[in-house]
């Protein structure tokens, strides 16, 4: 009788991928990147083990929105002080800090556990076309849609 394969840290091979965000829709890109970070694109996926790969996203400042989300979608944060609610539109966040826009979207699709935090640390987002990870020899990743 065969045993079900369970991955562990010793038999996981991690790859580095570069994804160009230019002209991509925010949600569609984020869901695909979240699946790569979790390792769901591999046959060795194991739910309780971090089997995912490293992802580098370039050109985050050229991400696109559908509809009127650039003006209508709002991001909120609160300082836990009275009157400490700060809101910013998606378009303004894209202009000021496009890296945070993508990181927030992708990390929201990962589990809210210690494993999810570990998976989120394998994400690197850059607003421009350059990245400092050439030594890792990343492969270009073609998105499905």
UniProtKB/Swiss-Prot annotation:
The protein's UniProt keywords, in alphabetical order, are:
Ribonucleoprotein, Ribosomal protein
In Pfam terms, one family for this protein is Ribosomal_L13
Under Gene Ontology molecular function, one entry of this record is:
structural constituent of ribosome
Superkingdom, natural source: Bacteria
Q: Does the keyword Ribosomal protein apply?
A: yes
SUPFAM superfamilies reported for this sequence:
Ribosomal protein L13
Output a single Gene Ontology CC term carried by this record.
Answer: cytosolic large ribosomal subunit
Q: Which GO terms describe its biological process?
A: negative regulation of translation; translation
Physiological role: This protein is one of the early assembly proteins of the 50S ribosomal subunit, although it is not seen to bind rRNA by itself. It is important during the early stages of 50S assembly.
Q: NCBIfam families of this UniProt entry?
A: rplM_bact
Cite the record's note on assembly: Part of the 50S ribosomal subunit.
The record's family statement is: Belongs to the universal ribosomal protein uL13 family.
Put simply, this protein is called Large ribosomal subunit protein uL13
Q: What is the organism field in this record?
A: Staphylococcus epidermidis (strain ATCC 12228 / FDA PCI 1200)
Q: What is the lineage of its organism?
A: Bacteria, Bacillati, Bacillota, Bacilli, Bacillales
């Amino acid at each position: 009788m065969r045993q079900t394969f369970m991955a562990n840290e010793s038999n996981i091979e991690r790859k580095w991928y570069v994804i160009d965000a230019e002209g991509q829709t925010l949600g569609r890109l984020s869901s695909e990147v979240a699946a790569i970070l979790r390792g769901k694109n591999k046959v060795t996926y194991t739910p309780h083990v971090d089997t995912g790969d490293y992802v580098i996203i370039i050109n985050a400042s050229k991400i696109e929105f559908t509809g009127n989300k650039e003006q209508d979608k709002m991001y909120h944060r609160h300082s836990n002080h009275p009157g400490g609610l700060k809101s910013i539109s998606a378009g303004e966040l894209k202009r000021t800090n496009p890296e945070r826009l993508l990181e927030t979207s992708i990390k929201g699709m990962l589990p809210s556990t210690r494993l999810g935090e570990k998976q989120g640390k394998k994400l690197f987002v850059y607003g421009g076309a350059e990245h400092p990870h050439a030594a890792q020899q990343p492969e270009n990743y073609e998105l499905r849609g």
